[in-house]
Regions:
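N-terminal Rossmann NAD(P)H-binding glycine-rich loop of SDR-like oxidoreductase domains
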Residues: 7-26
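Conserved glycine-rich Rossmann-like NAD(P)H-binding loop of the short-chain dehydrogenase/reductase
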Residues: 29-40
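Active-site YXXXK catalytic motif of short-chain dehydrogenase/reductase
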Residues: 99, 155, 159
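Conserved Rossmann-fold NAD(P)-dependent oxidoreductase catalytic core, especially the SDR/UDP-sugar
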Residues: 104-154
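NAD(P)-dependent short-chain dehydrogenase/reductase
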Residues: 134, 164-220, 225, 229
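C-terminal substrate-binding subdomain of Rossmann-fold SDR/epimerase-dehydratase oxidoreductases
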Residues: 214-217, 221-324
Length: 324
């Protein structure tokens, strides 16, 4: 694997972006976090503030994106900047500006600077899939990259369109791009996103607070943010000849919300978590990631118990509480 490449991470001061930056730094790469926010709080907590350059910018501004890529001499782009589920629903015009036009601007920058930019690794999402009932055949079913794509949210629809954009830029203009479809990200410092409320199933009990949650019988793919960061690095740097496709499912550990609550209770014995079966999640979580593992060597580092334990330890330390 090459080292000392400069990687421009859009959305690089956000939750996943900060962890991606940390993972890249630890693997020998120079990193520029490109974001509308220059708040380095998460980068600081991860201990990489001094190792990551921060550049203020807006992916919805085409000239700004091209200038950022050119002036940082980025050889790779990890494109994460997006308005997530709830924000996209509340601001549909902004969602199109950022998620659709912004992604187009990133691909266009890579096309324009084709002698400089080697690859764009970017975030699609499991949200492009339909609700589980569209796939459940009553057996041990898993959704592959070739299965039905029919998003039930505006956010998912923008990601579906992004995949069409990416294919055109790859097939018509030779832009080397790889997308991954992450599921539900969890870990220290998550604050936004459509599934961010699920963080409270860990955070509230860890701090001695009660919590009520719906979707008890719904399956969630719980993907630790450090595993997602690893996946983006592999998407960015796995040699092209080892890739069998351009879009990959990635996941962590599948568990119902009730099972996740039981895992928390096993770590925090006095946890007060009330779980009901009300509600249905808008997209399936049962992703088959055989292709990504075979092509890149990706392996999940955190099962649910280990991931929750790490998460709880960080939370308690930050709040001046004794470890469990």
């Amino acid at each position: 694997m090459a080292t000392n490449d400069t990687v421009l991470v859009t959305g690089g001061t956000g939750f996943i972006g900060s962890y991606v930056a940390k993972d890249l730094v630890e693997n020998g790469h120079d990193v520029v976090a490109y974001d509308r926010s220059t708040d380095d709080r998460i980068l600081s907590k991860l201990g990489v503030t001094e190792d990551v350059a921060i550049r203020r910018g807006d992916v919805s501004e085409a000239t700004d994106v091209v200038n950022a890529v050119a002036e940082t001499d980025a050889s790779h782009i990890v494109h994460l900047a997006a308005l997530l589920t709830n924000t996209a629903e509340s601001n549909p015009r902004a969602a199109l500006d950022v998620n659709v036009q912004g992604t187009s601007n990133v691909f266009e920058a890579a096309r324009t600077l084709d002698e400089q930019v080697e690859r764009v690794a970017w975030a699609s999402s499991a949200a492009i899939y339909a609700p589980p009932g569209n796939y459940d055949d009553g057996g041990d079913w898993w959704v592959t990259e070739d299965d039905l794509v029919y998003p039930d949210t505006l956010y998912g629809a923008t990601k579906g369109y992004n995949e069409h954009q990416a294919r055109v830029y790859n097939e018509e203009y030779g832009v080397d791009q790889v997308a991954i479809r992450p599921t539900v990200a969890y870990g220290p410092y998550r604050e936004t996103g459509g599934s961010a409320f699920l963080a409270n199933i860990v955070e509230k009990p860890a701090l001695g607070e009660s919590f009520s949650v719906e979707y008890g019988d719904q399956e969630i793919d719980w993907q630790h943010v450090e595993d997602i960061a690893q996946a983006f690095r592999l998407a960015a740097f796995t040699p092209e000849e080892e890739l069998s496709q351009r879009v990959y499912n990635v996941r962590g550990e599948l568990a119902t919300v009730q099972e996740a609550a039981e895992t928390v209770r096993g770590i925090v014995p006095d946890a007060e978590i009330d779980v009901s079966d009300k509600g249905e999640l808008p997209w399936t979580q049962r992703l088959d990631m055989t292709a990504f593992q075979a092509d890149t060597g990706y392996e999940v580092q955190y099962d649910l118990e280990a991931g929750f334990e790490m998460y709880i330890d960080v939370l308690r330390e930050e709040n001046g509480l004794e470890p469990l």
